[in-house]
Amino acid sequence: MAHLSLNQYKCTHIIIHGTCLSGLYPVPFTHNAHDYPHFNIYISFGGPKYCKTALNTYVIPLLHRILTTQFIYTYANITEKSPPKSPKHKNILSFNNNT
């Protein structure tokens, strides 16, 4: 597997969507890199309250080992008041390579 530098390819983005329990989420995560140019990686999970703990314990450390130059930019915990099929209905973990 070749190493991909997001610093060289500004438009490169990785999208992961799912739940902490079952893996893939049935509704596609539709945000694109050009919608939010300062975001490079979107990780969207829905599920129980311990989902954030699972992300902090397993997913984030793994990504830090893979993407050693990437830094967590923001974490938005969206409430259930959002429309069910809206991308904002999920917990969004965003990485930024401009730090």
Curated annotation (Swiss-Prot):
* Organism lineage: Eukaryota, Fungi, Dikarya, Ascomycota, Saccharomycotina
Q: What is this protein called?
A: Putative UPF0320 protein YDR543C
The record's section on InterPro entries has: DUF468
Query: What family, per the record?
Result: Belongs to the UPF0320 family.
Name the Pfam families for this protein. Answer: DUF468
Question: What is the species listed in this Swiss-Prot or TrEMBL entry?
Answer: Saccharomyces cerevisiae (strain ATCC 204508 / S288c)
* Renumbered residue ranges of the record's region Disordered: 80-99
UniProt miscellaneous comment: Contained within a telomeric X element core sequence.
